Design a protein with these regions (language model features):
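Gram-negative outer-membrane beta-barrel transporters
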Residues: 508-509, 646, 664-807, 906
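Face-selective signature of the C-terminal outer-membrane beta-barrel domain
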Residues: 311-329, 351-529, 708-710
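Short, acidic, small-residue-rich periplasmic hinge/interaction motif at the N-terminus
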Residues: 19-23, 30-37, 67-71, 81-122
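N-terminal periplasmic accessory domains that precede
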Residues: 85-89, 129-132, 151-153, 175, ...
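Extracytoplasmic beta-strand/coil segments of soluble accessory domains associated
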Residues: 130, 134-188
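Short acidic/polar hinge/loop motifs at secondary-structure boundaries
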Residues: 179-221
Length: 909
């Protein structure tokens, strides 16, 4: 009995809590190892409360070693002679890698917006700004295909490919350091079709042009933008670039289709009241869509020089900023040795384009640091952009025989020009867009009221020579335009004024934040005949947020929550191409006498000119509203919102029909033996004929209806694993349809002639798309090894589309003379010709088509070396995937994906 009692007395235990020495936070899963003098070991790990307990200890001296990722190891020597308590404090390892935020962060404000910091941008390893969009709710990783323009399409299901619904991209405003990117004077398109190049006039900002290495942070506003920003419909992208620093930053990136080189240097000087900075950088990108397909290549060169100077003077802070930037793209001649060579080895067509953009901007601001004063800040910005754009095309045209074409600029009857069967044709498009921007903004604060007001002026002009070609050697015989210089188009001016009030008021234990503003804007320069000229547009916008009382939940954690809502109009003005389209020329053959004797030939044509200008064109307006909620507790956050946007006046190309009367000369009475030259028209009998011909013009005929739910979740970093979980996603439903009646002409021949009627239909074009997308990112950082790696599981739970039924019956129709008649469903369907305007309804064409679940797993890895001065990074998209096959309409659809990878080396010295 005494021996058992002695054994029980000599066994002890030790317990305690492991905490962070800097903030006393608990550290779960810390490792505690105890070793006695005989090197016998006992160990334990701390639980979720940071507590540990080691039992079965004999009396003696022990060495206690405590380790935790990201903290200094603690070693203590302790004598055990009884049960004891030992609390352990671990100090963070300041030499190890600090936490890097590699995801976008949702702003918990009065509207839906996302902030992307420099660390997240670097971790994405982007080639252009478009790569950053995968961080938005509903976004997903895409391969950096740079052979065609990259367009933004916020809060939308489906891809943007139809120019009739491009207002969403055109109406997303990009702002860099307070200066907007404008492209409304872009007219760079070729009037003849070719498989070379691409024209994206009226599509908005090409995100390929924006390099990411100089970006400090970017805010993407998807909800209701401040009235400080106008000429937009869909969203705001506000980019702030780096200032100061003394590092040399170099980046080398290579992936399967592109190579990128960047080098930048910062300079910074500080004095007692003065701080000056200079930043300069150079970026070069070379992208190939496919090494075997040399036409689709794209190169980008950007150079930037930025400077700032800040002076503190009493309570005032004076800031002066300036920037000089250059962006160029260089495409060599796009000829393919396997596709574009004639029999003798010479190319049959070449294409060469160049784009050179220069920008100069400045900003001067005064800020009051005395918060008791009414005056808070006065900010003034000015910028100018000048572009030199050229497209040069050459083609060896082979028609097989001499061909008559119309080349006259004068309307009326003209003999055709006979062009040879084979010739060389050249076409040059010379564009010189020029933009000026000026803005002044005043901020006043009185109590809970913060008021900002200002005005803005924009000018657009194109000094280019336009399309230059020889009409007698046309690039294509189907060209319907004539050479027109761009510099004859008048300059356009946008004038805006705005006022906005922010207020925050405590209501009991709640607080209310509200922002209400009004923007007045108009354009001038188009001329009195345009309805839009000097027409005022008002954009009222309001957002509100209610911060609910804090609540204490289990374990003493504080829960913060809030509700927000917003509504507002957003307006986008038409571009220069929409307001001043090129005149169209058409011709109808009246006489075609083509004997074997060349001296007797004569082809007479009626030349007519169509002005596709729509003087009734209006600005596109989008009504947006949203409601949302967010939660924040102990480093965890969650937000969700529902939104709806309805733009019923989007820009699109619509068809219009006109009636053209021409002569038809009868050549049967011509006696060739009596001719000494071409026949005289006065000697020939003729009959009159009327032809319906169509042309395209810009109208406010598109409706885009967006609705959806966006959500995001962020955990705090789990210290035991040094891992953070982030998730976001969205359900989008987007409807596209025509909002004004459209024309449709059956493609049939009646009595050897084209069908004589054109139907006018209420619904002629419509589709809707929907999708549910989620993205779970697992971000792990190992400071001791200098490693950051993230795994994202991007799930497309479903996507689908449906073509909406078109109108079966027309509401009216046009006859050959151009007269409009109402369509009688009971009477006209019995008419043999008119009943062809009744369209058949095929059920299978309007079935909903759904694509089922698919998941891609993407990996990004960064290794820091030499005190974080060198980084080696790797990314692999679709390293794993789940893309099961599925059946659609009884047919098996097989799916497969291909991994895409790239790597980069980054220096910060």
């Amino acid at each position: 009995m005494s021996i058992l009692t002695l054994a029980l007395v000599t066994i002890f235990s030790i317990s305690g809590t492991i905490r962070d020495a800097s903030d006393s936070s608990i550290l779960p899963d810390a490792a505690i190892v105890m070793e006695d003098r005989e090197h016998k070991i006992k160990w334990a790990t701390s639980d979720e409360s940071g507590k540990y307990c080691i039992t079965g200890l004999h009396e003696g001296t022990y060495t206690i070693k405590t380790t935790y990722i990201g903290y200094h190891t603690t070693i203590k020597v302790i004598k055990i002679g009884k049960d004891c308590t030992l609390d352990i404090l671990l100090k963070p390892d300041q030499r190890s890698l600090n936490e890097v935020v590699v995801t976008a962060i949702e702003n918990h404000g009065t509207t839906s917006s996302t902030r992307i910091g420099n660390e997240a941008i670097e971790h994405i390893q982007p080639s252009s700004f478009a790569d950053l969009l995968e961080l938005l709710p509903g976004g997903s990783a895409k391969d950096p295909v740079l052979s065609s323009p990259q367009l933004i399409n916020l809060r939308a299901a489906g891809s943007l490919t139809d120019s009739d619904y491009a207002t969403s991209a055109l109406g997303t405003k990009f702002v860099i350091d307070g200066h907007p990117i404008n492209n409304d004077a872009n007219l760079q398109s070729t009037p003849a079709y070719s498989s070379y190049g691409s024209s994206y006039v009226n599509f908005g900002t090409d995100m390929r042009e924006i390099s990411t290495e100089d970006i400090e942070n970017v805010e993407i506003v998807r909800g209701i933008a401040s009235v400080k920003y106008g000429d937009l419909t869909s969203g705001l992208v506000n980019i702030i670039r780096k200032k100061g620093g003394n590092d040399i930053h170099a980046r080398f990136k290579s992936d399967m289709k592109s190579k990128l080189f960047y080098i930048g240097k910062g300079f910074e000087w500080k004095d007692t009241n003065v701080k000056s900075t200079i930043n300069t950088s150079l970026n070069y990108l070379d992208s190939k869509a496919d090494p075997r397909y040399t036409r689709q290549n794209w190169k980008r060169l950007t150079v930037s020089l930025r400077g700032s100077r800040t002076i503190e003077q009493d309570d005032l802070l004076h800031s002066l900023n300036a920037n000089l930037d250059y962006t160029g793209s260089f495409d060599n001649e796009k000829s393919d040795a396997n596709l574009d060579l004639s029999e003798n080895g010479t190319p049959i067509e070449t294409y060469k384009s160049s784009y050179n953009k220069f920008s100069l901007g400045g900003n001067y601001s005064i800020k009051n640091t005395d918060e008791e004063k009414l005056f808070r800040s006065w900010d003034n910005s000015i910028s100018l952009y000048y572009e030199m754009d050229e497209i040069n095309r050459w083609r060896s045209v082979s028609l097989g025989l001499s061909t008559p074409v119309s080349t006259s600029l004068d309307v009326g009857e003209h003999d055709a020009t006979i062009i040879p069967a084979k010739y060389d044709a050249t076409l040059k498009v010379d564009g010189r867009p020029f933009y000026l921007f000026a803005q002044s903004n005043l901020s006043l604060v009185k109590g809970i009221h913060h008021i900002q007001m200002g005005f803005e002026w924009n000018m657009d002009k194109n000094f280019g020579k336009g399309s230059i070609f020889d009409p007698t050697r046309p690039f294509s015989t189907s060209m319907s335009v004539r050479p027109r210089p761009y510099y004859v188009i008048p300059a356009m001016h946008q004038l805006s004024a705005y006022s906005e009030e922010k207020m925050k008021k405590e209501i009991g234990k709640c607080s209310l934040e509200a922002i209400m503003g009004l923007r007045l804007e108009t354009i001038s320069g188009a001329g009195e005949k345009y309805d839009i000229n000097l027409k005022p547009y008002l954009d009222p916008r309001a957002t509100v947020r209610l911060n609910l009382p804090d609540a204490m939940i289990g374990g003493g954690y504080r829960l913060k929550s809030g509700l927000y809502a917003g509504i507002g109009y957003h307006t986008k003005f038409p571009t220069m191409d929409m307001l001043f389209p090129e005149p169209l020329y058409g011709s109808l053959t009246q006489l075609n006498y083509w004997p074997t004797e060349e001296n007797l030939r004569r082809v007479n044509m009626l030349v007519y000119r169509i002005d596709p200008t729509n003087t009734e064109l209006k600005a596109a307006r989008n009504l947006k509203w949203e409601v949302g909620a967010d939660l924040l507790c102990d480093g965890y956050s969650f937000s969700i919102n529902y939104f709806q946007e309805d733009m019923t006046s989007g820009f699109r190309y619509a068809s219009q029909y006109i009636s053209v009367e021409s002569k038809r000369y009868d050549t049967s009475s011509i006696d060739k033996s009596t001719l000494s030259g071409p026949p005289q028209l006065s000697d020939l009998p003729y009959s009159l004929d009327t032809t319906l011909t169509s042309y395209s013009f810009t109208t406010n005929g598109s409706r885009t209806l967006k609705k959806g739910v966006e959500f995001s979740f962020y955990s705090k970093r789990i210290k035991s694993l040094n891992t953070k979980f982030s998730a976001n996603g969205a359900w989008f439903r987007t409807e596209y349809m025509n909002s004004v009646p459209e024309y449709y002409k059956p493609s049939v021949i009646m009595d050897g002639k084209p069908y004589p009627y054109v139907g006018i239909y209420e619904l002629n074009d419509g589709k809707y798309y929907d999708s549910l997308v989620s993205n779970l990112m697992i971000d792990t950082q190992i400071p001791e090894l200098g490693l950051i790696f993230s795994t994202s599981l991007q799930c497309l739970w479903f996507s689908g589309y449906k073509t909406m039924p078109t109108s079966k019956y027309p509401i009216s129709y046009i006859d050959k003379s151009g007269k409009i008649h109402d369509f009688d469903k009971e009477k006209d369907v019995e008419d043999g010709a008119l009943r062809l305007l009744v369209r058949e309804y095929t059920e299978s064409l309007y079935q909903y088509q759904r694509t089922p679940f698919a998941m891609n797993v993407n990996l990004k890895l960064t290794k820091k070396l030499y005190r974080n001065k060198i980084s080696c990074s790797l990314y692999v998209n679709r390293i794993f995937d789940i893309t099961p096959n599925y059946y659609r309409n009884g047919t098996l659809v097989r799916r497969s994906v291909t991994p895409y990878f790239g790597m980069e080396l980054d220096f910060k010295i």
